[in-house]
């Protein structure tokens, strides 16, 4: 099993979710996060409400900007399909398109049923 963590533009969340659901991957966690890459932050790119003072009062000229972090667990054989789908929706060729991390998962346990492994996805 693989954990896929995608940091994307908030404005791409709905489309990404729709595509993943259409491929049979409706289970995911989405978090609002602040971050930046190597480039200077694109301060005008706001996909959800954030206090401008929070952005403008940061020291230095490298500001954190809002992003959405999606996390989902998929069987090993589906990881490439999910990564490609996320890339297709989110790749514009511009700074700020995001990052995708693919990590191994040792086990999953559903608390309610005690199911383990892929049955718990």
UniProtKB/Swiss-Prot annotation:
Keywords per UniProt: Nitrogen fixation, Transcription, Transcription regulation
A GO-annotated cellular component: cytosol
Swiss-Prot/TrEMBL GO biological process terms: nitrogen fixation; regulation of nitrogen utilization
Pfam families: P-II (PF00543)
One function term, GO molecular function aspect: ATP binding
PROSITE patterns tied to this protein: PII_GLNB_CTER (PS00638), PII_GLNB_DOM (PS51343)
UniProt cross-references to InterPro entries, sorted A to Z: N-reg_PII, N-reg_PII-like_a/b, N-reg_PII/ATP_PRibTrfase_C, N-reg_PII_CS
Family label: Belongs to the P(II) protein family.
Function: Could be involved in the regulation of nitrogen fixation.
Name this protein carries in UniProt: Nitrogen fixation nifHD region glnB-like protein 2
